[in-house]
Amino acid sequence: MRIGIIGGGAAGMAAALAASEYKNAQIVLMERQARLGKKLSATGNGRCNLSNLHAAQGGYHGDEPGFHEYALSQYPPAETLEWFRDLGLYTVTEASGKVYPYSDQANSVVDVLRFALDRPNIEVLTDFEVMKVRKDGDAFHVTAKDRTLVFDKLIIACGGLAGTKLGGTMAGYKLLRSFGHKCTKLRPTLVQVKTSWPGVSGLKGVRANCHAAIYHNAKLHRESVGEIQFTEFGLSGPVIYEISRDACQGSGEWECRLDFLPDLRASELMRPLMMKRNSNLNAEDLFTGILHNQIGRAHV
């Protein structure tokens, strides 16, 4: 049985390894770019957060709430880590439940998958851009610029439009539409937030833990606690990724509020501030010892 897989990212490589276990299966993995796993190499700021041991129902959002339950029940995080361990990848789990390669390098994950593909019944084709796919009876005809390959089974794992600089295109959507599948409206998710506050560029690169809340028309919409990072045009970081998807889905006024001292009551904070106010300190130094220096100065 010949199995074709379009897309050499994380899903495509994993699919090729799984399919290769079938008796008499011959696998052809087709990738448009010059190398496999280009997006995977960049994920997690180059560290690759490949799972989360605390994955649960409350951590997922979308129009199909049952999908993640099915996926996690079929292949829970513990089994994912065991699968990677069998491939030779050692991992470390942070207190948050996030799992990273022990090397702390996303390229380690890519290399482990790439080395595992070196099997007699797996052929990898890079620089292979699929132009068209058609079904003729029980066979799938996959056409590239210079040739057509025929398969008994076909897996489309092209990935999405995210990360256009890393190769994200509409190609996968077009192939799926050619088979009659419908695509929902595309929206950004896991993205940074652009803000209108003029002082944000001065905090570029600063990281801090805080309570972040997003408001829609002055009403609390979603909140989370964790690390944020300031950019030259706004906010980034895990917490922002978690709440930003909502701001892309509706009109009206959206506001992001940050509390850098969520565990302190206002009364607890006022005493040291009043003491400093009565000293010879400059106003910009009032928050020294309480907040990151640059954040403190931006508040004054």
Predicted regions and their residues:
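Glycine-rich active-site loop/strand segments that organize a redox cofactor
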Residues: 45-93
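Glycine-rich FAD pyrophosphate-binding loop
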Residues: 4, 20-45
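Beta1/beta-strand and adjacent pyrophosphate-binding region of the FAD-binding site
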Residues: 1-11
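Glycine-rich loop(s) and the adjacent beta-strand/alpha-helix scaffold that form part
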Residues: 153-199
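Short hydrophobic core segments
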Residues: 4-6, 30, 130, 149-165, ...
